């Protein structure tokens, strides 16, 4: 008889250390609207604010000063931010909607708190560096990689102004399957910048790229990858590292119905190297029974919930949500069962909405 299927669970507290206290005035209507689709006058107001915001701060390059509070050993620091970077706006919108990548944030605070080396690939303004470096239990270091020149300036400025440079090292480069230069396609939203070998009609900037295997840095214990479809190239460039060092990997995976093979390629690449895949979800009580769902039952900074690492067979990827943060844990690496409790699993527990 085979082993009883299990998922892994742990009680966690979600923490959002960075608090944006001021955005450019044109960003106000955009942030307050959140992810809901406004109607009537609100829709017109938002549309006008959006056009002015991108026209003034994007096309014309006018300054868009904002402010963020970050905890520091000597007290809270108020640091300037570039409000033209829409990733700051998205951070505010997600927090108002209940949380910013709550499952990944909680995972890192829970698992990486003891120390180690973390690579943040596609760091943008440095949220995960700030998250880890402001955790009193974290004794490790973060290497934050960002290829887009303007976004890298925001990353470096955030880490420097927050006084976190001794814990977070910023690298102006992308990671790929080769060393050299590749075109980076940028647009209105910094979080959607992507390396694209055949940029075509899109506006592209040539950026420096390196392979994970060619970096002269401390070997990573954890790698977080958010590179808008370039995940497989990043993994291929670190094949030797993945097979030898065996870091834990978390990466964004989008289901593209037109290219299902591209969706599954990073998953196959990792499982072929002995990694176990997990879907990060939340355990919640519903009508007297336990279910596994996408949204945490309790939301916001300081909320306590039960994080669930649910097995993700590749054959079931298309049945899950379109966008997933996938956890890849080396099957031969100890530690996961020490931090999570194994619990019997059945497909009936899944609430896949």
Positions of predicted regions on the chain:
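S-adenosyl-L-methionine
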Residues: 2-158, 162-167, 198-200, 282-284, ...
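Short, conserved loop/helix-junction motifs that constitute active-site signature segments
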Residues: 132-137, 238-245, 270
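Core alpha/beta nucleotide-donor-binding catalytic domains of modification enzymes
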Residues: 149, 156-190
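Conserved Class I S-adenosyl-L-methionine
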Residues: 264-280
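Proline-aspartate-enriched helix->loop->beta-strand connector
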Residues: 247-250
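Short strand-turn motif at the edge of the Rossmann-like AdoMet-binding core
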Residues: 147-148, 228, 252-254
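Short internal loop-to-helix segment that lines adenine-nucleotide cofactor pockets
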Residues: 96-119, 167-169, 181-186, 190-245, ...
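Conserved S-adenosyl-L-methionine
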Residues: 171-173, 275-284
């Amino acid at each position: 008889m085979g082993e009883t299927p299990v998922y892994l669970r742990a009680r966690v507290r979600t923490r959002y250390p960075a608090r944006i206290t001021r955005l450019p005035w044109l960003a106000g209507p955009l942030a307050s609207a959140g992810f809901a689709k406004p109607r009537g006058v609100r829709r017109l107001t938002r549309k006008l604010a959006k056009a002015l915001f991108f026209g003034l701060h994007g096309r014309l390059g006018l300054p868009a000063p904002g402010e963020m509070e970050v905890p520091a050993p000597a007290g809270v620091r108020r640091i300037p931010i570039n409000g033209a970077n829409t990733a700051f706006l998205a951070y505010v919108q997600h927090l108002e909607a209940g949380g910013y990548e709550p499952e990944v944030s909680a995972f890192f605070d829970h698992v990486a708190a003891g120390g180690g080396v973390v690579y943040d690939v596609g760091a943008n303004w440095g949220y995960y560096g700030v998250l880890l470096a402001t955790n009193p239990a974290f004794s490790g270091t973060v290497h934050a990689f960002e290829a887009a020149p303007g976004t890298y300036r925001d990353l470096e400025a955030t880490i420097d102004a927050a006084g976190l440079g001794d814990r977070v090292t910023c690298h102006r480069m992308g990671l790929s399957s080769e060393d050299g230069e590749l075109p980076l396609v940028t647009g209105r939203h910094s979080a959607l910048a992507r390396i694209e070998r055949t940029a075509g009609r899109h506006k592209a900037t040539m950026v420096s790229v390196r392979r994970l295997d060619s970096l002269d840095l401390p070997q990573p214990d954890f790698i977080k990858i958010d590179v808008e479809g370039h995940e497989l190239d990043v993994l291929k460039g670190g094949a030797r590292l993945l097979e030898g060092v065996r870091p834990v990997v978390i990466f964004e995976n989008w289901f593209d119905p037109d290219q299902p093979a591209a969706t599954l390629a990073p998953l196959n690449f990792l499982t072929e190297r002995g990694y176990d895949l997990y879907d990060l979800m939340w355990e919640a009580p519903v009508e007297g029974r336990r279910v596994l769902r996408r949204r945490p039952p309790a939301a916001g900074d300081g909320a306590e919930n039960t994080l669930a690492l649910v097995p993700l067979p590749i054959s079931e990827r298309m049945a899950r949500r379109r966008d997933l943060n996938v956890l890849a844990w080396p099957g031969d690496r100890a530690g996961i069962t020490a931090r999570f409790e194994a619990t019997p699993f059945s497909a009936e527990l899944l609430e896949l909405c």
